[in-house]
C-alpha cells in the first residue's frame, strides 16, 4: 500500500513478545495482509512445526509502517531457509512500499547471522534488490464469490463438473463439521492417507492441532462420512470474509463416490452460512492436477508472485515435489504401509515448511 509522506527513513528491528498487540493492530489496517501474516498462524507454526518465528518490524517515529514475518526453517534433508511464512502459501512484506528495501536488507542480514543461505517470500511487496529472483509463472491462486444459496451454488459449478458432483450427492453421505477430538481424528486419518497416496510425507499431527487451537472459531474441519466411515476431510481457515480449505484430501474409496466433490460443495454452503462471501481455493502449481481440478470448478487462475534470495555461492533449497530428483522417492513413498508413513513422515515434512 502507499503510505502518507513521512520524514526520515524507516528503522527495522526484530519484534519481541511485547510487540504482539501492536503488530496485530497494524495488520488490521492492511488490506493485503493474509491469514498467514496473522500472529496466530505464526505462533501455531512455531509451536506445531518447531520453526522459530522472527518478525521484522519497520517503524517511523515509533509507529509500525511495514512488517515481514519469517520462520527459520532447518532440516537435515532440505537445509536452512528463512521463509515467509512457514507451511503457508502466502506471506511476504506487508505495509508501506517505501519500507520494503529496509526489510529486505534486514532479512538478508538475519539470514547471514542464522547461517541460512536462502530467504523465501511467498507474496507481498516484491524485493527490487540485487540477488533476488522473482517467479510469476509457477503458481496460481483461485478465488471465487460464493453464490446466494445452495441451489445457486450448484448451478455455479460448470456443467461437466456439476454432473460429477450430482453423482456424489446421490449417495447417503453424512456431513460433519467441528474442531473437537473426533473431527481432528477423522481429519488426520483421511489426510495422512491422502498425502501418502500422493507420495508426500504428512505434516506433524501437532501442527494441525496448534492451528485449530490458535484460530478457535476461525478454523474448523468438515468431514464427509459414508456408512460411518470418513472418506474426505478438510481443515479450513476463515479470514476477512473468505473460507480457505487449506489441508484437505480423501481416502482411496472417496474417488469412486465423488466424496471430494461433495466435500468442497458442502464447504461452500457451510461457509456461506457462517457469513463468508468468498471461496479461496488456495494455490496450485501451474498445469498440475490440482490446478486443472480447480479450473474444472469454474475458478479462474490468478498468477502469484514469489521471490527468493540465495547467498553467494549457495544453491537454493529444492522442496518442489515435481522436481525430477524426487520422483523415485515419491513412488517409493506411495508403497509404504500407512503406519510407517505416518511414523516417519512428520520428521521429514517439518523441513517442507
Regions found by a protein language model. Name each.
Residues 51-53, 113-116, 274-276:
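Short, high-confidence coil segments that cap the C-terminus of an alpha-helix
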Residues 57-61, 65, 88, 101-110, ...:
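Aromatic (often tryptophan-rich) hydrophobic motifs at membrane interfaces
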Amino acid at each position: 500500500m502507499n503510505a502518507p509522506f513521512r520524514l526520515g527513513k524507516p528503522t527495522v528491528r526484530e519484534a519481541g513478545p511485547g510487540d504482539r498487540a501492536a503488530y496485530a493492530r497494524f495488520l488490521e489496517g492492511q488490506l493485503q495482509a493474509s491469514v498467514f501474516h496473522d500472529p496466530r498462524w505464526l505462533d501455531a507454526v512455531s509451536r506445531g512445526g518447531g520453526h522459530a518465528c522472527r518478525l521484522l518490524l519497520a517503524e517511523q517515529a515509533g509507529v509500525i509502517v511495514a512488517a515481514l514475518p519469517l520462520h527459520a526453517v532447518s532440516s537435515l534433508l532440505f537445509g536452512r531457509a528463512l521463509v515467509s511464512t512457514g507451511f503457508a502459501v502466502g506471506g511476504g512484506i506487508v505495509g508501506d512500499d517505501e519500507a520494503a528495501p529496509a526489510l529486505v536488507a534486514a532479512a538478508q542480514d538475519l539470514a547471514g547471522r542464522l547461517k541460512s543461505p536462502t530467504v523465501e517470500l511467498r507474496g507481498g511487496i516484491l524485493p527490487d534488490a540485487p540477488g533476488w529472483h522473482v517467479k510469476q509463472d509457477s503458481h496460481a491462486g483461485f478465488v471465487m464469490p460464493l453464490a446466494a444459496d445452495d441451489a445457486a451454488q450448484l448451478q455455479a459449478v460448470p456443467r461437466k463438473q456439476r454432473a460429477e458432483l450430482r453423482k456424489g450427492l446421490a449417495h447417503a453421505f453424512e456431513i460433519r463439521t467441528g474442531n473437537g477430538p473426533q473431527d481432528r481424528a477423522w481429519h488426520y486419518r483421511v489426510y495422512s492417507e491422502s498425502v501418502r497416496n500422493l507420495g508426500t510425507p504428512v505434516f506433524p499431527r501437532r501442527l494441525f492441532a496448534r492451528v485449530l487451537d490458535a484460530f478457535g472459531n476461525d478454523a474448523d474441519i468438515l468431514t464427509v462420512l459414508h456408512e460411518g466411515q470418513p472418506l474426505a476431510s478438510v481443515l479450513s481457515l476463515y479470514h476477512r470474509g473468505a473460507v480457505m480449505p487449506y489441508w484437505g484430501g480423501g481416502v482411496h474409496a472417496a474417488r469412486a463416490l465423488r466424496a471430494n466433490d461433495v466435500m468442497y460443495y458442502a464447504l461452500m454452503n457451510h461457509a456461506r452460512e457462517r457469513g463468508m462471501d468468498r471461496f479461496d481455493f488456495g494455490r496450485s502449481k501451474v498445469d498440475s492436477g490440482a490446478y486443472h481440478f480447480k479450473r474444472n470448478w469454474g475458478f479462474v487462475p490468478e498468477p502469484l508472485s514469489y521471490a527468493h534470495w540465495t547467498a553467494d555461492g549457495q544453491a537454493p533449497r529444492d522442496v518442489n515435489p515435481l522436481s525430477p530428483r524426487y520422483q523415485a522417492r515419491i513412488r517409493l513413498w506411495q508403497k509404504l504401509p500407512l503406519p510407517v508413513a505416518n511414523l516417519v513422515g512428520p520428521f521429514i515434512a517439518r523441513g517442507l515448511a
